[in-house]
Amino acid sequence: MSETPIWPPRWPRAHGGPLAAGDFRATPEDFVVEEVFDFAPEGQGEHLWLWIEKRDLTTPEAAKRVARACGVRPRDVGYSGLKDRVAVTRQWLSVHLPGREAPAELTATLATSGIAILDARRHPRKLKRGVHRLNRFTLRLTGDIAEHPGLSRQWQTLCEAGVPNYFGPQRFGREGRNLIMARSAFARGWRKRDDPHGMQLSAARSFLFNEVLAARLRTDCWRTPRDGDVLALAGSASRFVTETVDATLLDRARRGDVAPTGPLWGKGRQESGAEVAALEADIMATHAALSQGLEAAGARMDRRPLCLRLETPALRLDEEGGVVVSFGLPRGAFATAVLRELMQHPVL
């Protein structure tokens, strides 16, 4: 029988809990995100790529405003990732403009609606979802956390050991609303037309993944491979199953070369084996309404690393008494997974 969890769930932390209370979004300027790509627009083609900076605006809404300003359909605008609303974010959008230029007043028009065009280049193809390599975060922390004497030491621990790769609260909606809607949808039979963007499916899969990760944390094996683990290779989409853990694998895991993964539940073969498969099956049985609902809806089984490593992390004090942390995370990872290991906040 599926249980209705306390919200937010009390998923465990990895490094001794948060140090002190604080804020990280007092203003949009406190939360800056920039997409990082491994390629650049070629300079010619049917699609005009716009490097934009948006403030206090969701990515879908920004795309709609760009489409309207360019006189094209919303589906003619592409973007790689969904960025936070209460933030300053920089990302590419592509606009299908074959044989014509963008309106002369485009920059001025968008500037009035919270969107600045920082660069514009042509490219032969539309920007597809999920093609950026990582997101670069620059976050300003204020409140008690900024003055805590243990902050630098805790930050160094996160940089060296990594953090649990939890899906963040944004995935579940306010007070877990997306998950509540998923439960209702599965009870009556999920339909794509009622969930066109897949938010309910994503919330259910994310919750189950977080439950598996939490169980591994409670036994302190979220970074350490176990028999039957599906291990992800750092910096690639490759993964493999280990039947027996040896000293070489343990050393590779300590160095961050490989990481255990957890399930993004759906229809298909469960890749894990042995004790790992048994643990995952027990959790899916506990939340059968969600796991079976995902299978019936046709979501495809996938995996996600349990441990999240920070790329080029840095910490500094600013002139106003706050602390600024910066780091890169692979696409699909949440900055809140890092922040919850540092500080207390209602959404963490």
Curated annotation (Swiss-Prot):
Catalytic activity reported: uridine(13) in tRNA = pseudouridine(13) in tRNA
Active site: D84 (nucleophile)
PANTHER family: TRNA PSEUDOURIDINE SYNTHASE D
GO cellular component, one term: cytosol
InterPro entries per UniProt: PsdUridine_synth_cat_dom_sf (IPR020103), PsdUridine_synth_TruD (IPR001656), PsdUridine_synth_TruD_CS (IPR020119), PsdUridine_synth_TruD_insert (IPR011760), TruD_catalytic (IPR042214), TruD_insert_sf (IPR043165), TruD_pseudoU_synthase (IPR050170)
Domain TRUD as annotated: residue spans: 162-308
This protein's record includes keyword tRNA processing: yes
GO MF: RNA binding; tRNA pseudouridine(13) synthase activity
Family according to the record: Belongs to the pseudouridine synthase TruD family.
Gene Ontology biological-process annotations: tRNA pseudouridine synthesis
Classification via SUPFAM superfamilies: Pseudouridine synthase
The protein's name in its UniProt record: tRNA pseudouridine synthase D
Domain of life where this protein originates: Bacteria
EC category: isomerase
Gene expressing this chain: truD
EC id: 5.4.99.27
